[in-house]
Regions:
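Iron-sulfur cluster-binding electron-transfer modules in prokaryotic oxidoreductases
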Residues: 1-239
């Protein structure tokens, strides 16, 4: 099984520790993981800004670069969901899309493919889990609150294996944090207020940290939570190797 590690552009530039933690944990579990150095942005920012047609070349290049891997794993539910859900629609009739059927968020890969039953290290602290919109509703990392289905949460399943951890979820646990990619740029006041409300609910749980698998949401909330001195940690950063 060969895995291609996809590190989104914003992770590479602003949140590199998430990419490093993902690579190290995959190696810990004996995965044959490779980082294709020619990878670029998945094209989501361009498409979300209304330039979907101009993103097609980027999308085709991404698809061609990763097509020979068995799985593509990313430390970002948002970017993974974009490749999975929107690539086939954008490339329909123009380019054979292979990557959409191989892309997975790191939690999804650990839970559904590797089916891990242990994690290394320990984290003796209380955490509040952030469920991202894309992770919940497009990747199925947890059950959406608006649907009458049997509750599940793959993020919490993974965290439950961490020695010493205490897990909480905030009120309105799967409500948007306000990031939304270009939304945070085009509607900064609304985005910030949504983020403040989200952080306030995380803090109300009594947790010492906020954690989750979607680096984009965590990056957004980290800027807002800084004045509250509320640490935000990528989920794999809690698992020391």
């Amino acid at each position: 099984m060969r895995v291609g590690l996809f590190v989104p552009c914003y992770v590479d530039a602003l949140y590199p520790e998430a990419g490093v933690a993902t690579y190290k944990l995959l190696k810990h579990y004996g995965v044959d993981v490779d980082y294709p150095e020619k990878q670029t942005c998945c094209g989501q920012p361009m498409a979300n800004a209304g330039f979907q047609n101009k993103s097609e070349k980027v999308i085709e290049a991404f698809d061609d670069l990763f097509r020979d891997y068995d799985y593509i794993v990313a430390p970002s539910a948002s970017c993974a969901a974009y490749v999975k859900v929107y690539y086939p629609k954008i490339l329909e009739g123009k380019h054979e899309c292979v990557s959409s059927g191989k892309i997975m968020d790191i939690v999804e890969f650990l839970h559904d493919v590797l089916k891990v039953d242990h994690v290394p290290g320990k984290f003796p602290h209380a955490v509040s889990v952030h469920n991202s919109c894309h992770g919940v509703r497009e990747l199925g990392l947890s059950s959406p609150s608006e649907r009458n289905v049997q509750p599940f949460n793959k993020i919490i399943d993974l965290l439950n294996m961490v020695d010493g951890i205490t897990i909480h979820e905030p009120e309105r646990k799967d409500e948007c944090c306000g990031f939304g990619g270009m939304f945070s740029i085009e509607e900064p006041a609304v985005s910030t207020r949504m983020g403040e409300d989200k952080i306030r609910r995380h803090m109300a749980t009594g947790a010492e940290y906020v954690t989750g698998p979607d680096s984009s949401c965590l990056m957004h909330m980290a800027g807002i939570a800084k004045k509250e001195k509320m640490p935000i940690q990528f989920i794999l950063s809690l698992i020391h190797i």
